[in-house]
Amino acid sequence: MLVLGWLTVLLGVLAMETYVPALRTLSELLDKGVEHSKAKGIDAAALLKERLAPDMFPLALQVQLACHHAKDGTARAIGQEPPKIDTSELPFTELKALIEQTVQTLSTTSAKAFDGAEDRRIARA
């Protein structure tokens, strides 16, 4: 357990209640992007290559990295080898599937797996 002043936070609960809702929101935003592109007659695939700023990654890679960080952080916290990331370009449907697969992976990780995580040294990759 991680002790923050008077507040004790279970790392597993914290991870699940942070990553899962954020990933579900990201999935909904992708749906809105597809709807917007249809309404405006824009190629939806083109949106995946867009960047909010010149020094940012394209949207598709941002989604992949969000999934990777959720899985990677969780794996490292519970003492497992983090999964490899595939950064090949994916269409909207596959990005949504990646998000759902990440949510499922996180959802099947038991809070008990985080026991001792507060004392575990995590090496930077």
How should these model regions be labeled?
Residues 19-22, 26-29, 33, 66, ...:
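Amphipathic alpha-helices that form helix-helix packing interfaces
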Residues 37-49, 108-125:
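Acidic interhelical loop/turn segments
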Residues 29-57, 73-87:
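Helix-loop segments that flank and shape redox-cofactor active sites
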Residues 9, 16-20, 92-108, 115, ...:
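Mature, function-bearing regions of proteins
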